[in-house]
């Protein structure tokens, strides 16, 4: 039974309930909060997967945090998912193993889940619940923030217009990322998506300064990394990569490993984004948020939904998964009057390489494009194996062009896309009719296809190409074709750029290409 009674329903009146409840409420209102600050219960009536059902609960609130004390003294925390009469359903973040229905005590805190945030969190490693695991001291909180964040007024959002140079040619030239964008990496098991994300972290920087007065010093850049359900090898890879590059002091890691509780994965990305919002909007830093693996997050969501016996949607995922994913992805961007920004790169592994699976399908709806990691390219030893045809950046048009990158950027990108797509068709046709049946134009497209994958897409994991070097490399490939075949580039552009470096080319580099 409950040892004390809460008083958090100040609008409750005795007229609307039975006299006994009304009397309890009056006692709660007049309770001395110094001696009885919180409500404790020993009324666990059932445990179902990650959920605990409490009975005889008075005035429980939706999303309220509950602290559990197990018989051995272990502390766990949970959140109220549903209240029905005197029963409350609580989702336990650290898992329900060891919870005894007779001896476990539950304490209702009367508050939502808040996380301590501070600029000192940079350089620290936390578990999926936000507790330090690097043997360092607890965080001296500057603020305690709601992990669900604050809604941003759409009118105060700034349209992302500053291109981030990643040093990776297929991204910079054909799928340019703007500061404040949310763009996921669609990958699959066994593909080098972690290496690509680490390379972006190492090499990301602005092409040039924008009109606004902002601080572009390196100290003003921070990375928030959240891992959900990853193995120890992946966590160690990112940690060692940050340490080797000397950027660990600007990185905050949240690690929920594969052997950690599944249910903890639901709050891990929200803790990371709350920290990122504090760094971006209070400390005015430019924050890059990497979330991996969003597929593990969605499966944790499905597990809770199944335990609550909700009506399942496609492939057993809950019908509200779209809304839930949006509450994470929409926390990227820039805000008027604040110097910081949040750029999101979620990583998700497509089950069975299926892009129509609900997780990549819904993610593609919400985010502003995607970077598609291709297994066939990976099998041909191409790194990074980015397939540019299904990849997309919806904010690219506003981040490139004269004054931002170079005036030929958009036209070169369109022409490379067109030639690569035609080259793929020719390659498929060659498999049917043979090379002898191809026209001279078809052979040019086939040559372009091979050189595009070998020289443009392929680069080393520590090779950092500027966007201008990548554009020049694109022109070098387009010179395979005569001018009249470059139909996507205006005449004025071909006159200026087509033969611009022809006399300066080193003959050895042409033969190598």
Swiss-Prot record:
The lineage of its organism: Eukaryota, Metazoa, Chordata, Craniata, Vertebrata. Its main location: membrane. It is found in: Apical cell membrane; Basolateral cell membrane. GO terms for cellular component: apical plasma membrane; basolateral plasma membrane; cytoplasm; cytosol; extrinsic component of synaptic vesicle membrane; lateral plasma membrane; membrane; microvillus. Coiled coil: none annotated. The keyword Repeat does not apply. ATP binds at residue 394. Residues 1-21 are annotated as: Disordered. This is V-type proton ATPase subunit B, kidney isoform. It comes from Mus musculus.
